[in-house]
Each structure stands twice: as structure tokens, then as C-alpha cells.
UniProtKB/Swiss-Prot annotation:
Source species taxonomy: Bacteria, Pseudomonadati, Pseudomonadota, Betaproteobacteria, Burkholderiales
Signal peptide interval: none
Family note: Belongs to the UPF0434 family.
Species: Cupriavidus necator (strain ATCC 17699 / DSM 428 / KCTC 22496 / NCIMB 10442 / H16 / Stanier 337)
Identification of the protein by name: UPF0434 protein H16_A0605
GO cellular component: cytosol
A Pfam family: Trm112p
Length: 68
């Protein structure tokens, strides 16, 4: 991900800073605990496409935590 793009992108909900997770290909908003996917190199900045993100584990917004 281009660092210049990362500097201007913000969470669409809280307008907070995002962190790039290279391994998961996601942009993480720690304030809202959301992970926005990056598909084919393009960040998908739609709240409906984000998944809940909790440090240390992923949480499915429609079901139980994964990894349990």
C-alpha cells in the first residue's frame, strides 16, 4: 500500500487514523475496532464491508468469535 494513500485515508465512521495490516490485507481502525479489506490493491472503505477486529482475535459481527 502506498504510504501517501495511507496518510490521507481515514475511517469513514470516526475519521480516525488507520493502520495497514500487510499480512491480512486490511486497514485497521483501532478506535472503532473495524478492519476494512483491501481487494486487488484497492481499500474498500465501506462500513458494511468491514469486519470487527479485536486485538489478538477476529470477531464476526454476525456470530461468535472465530478461533474459539
Amino acid at each position: 500500500m502506498d504510504n501517501r494513500l495511507l496518510e490521507i485515508l481515514v475511517c469513514p465512521l470516526c475519521k480516525g487514523k488507520l493502520e495497514y495490516d500487510r499480512a491480512a490485507q486490511e486497514l485497521i481502525c483501532h478506535a472503532d475496532k473495524l478492519a476494512y479489506p483491501i481487494r486487488d490493491g484497492i481499500p474498500v472503505m465501506l462500513a458494511d464491508e468491514a469486519r470487527q477486529s479485536v486485538p489478538g482475535r477476529a470477531v464476526n459481527p454476525d456470530g461468535p468469535a472465530s478461533g474459539n
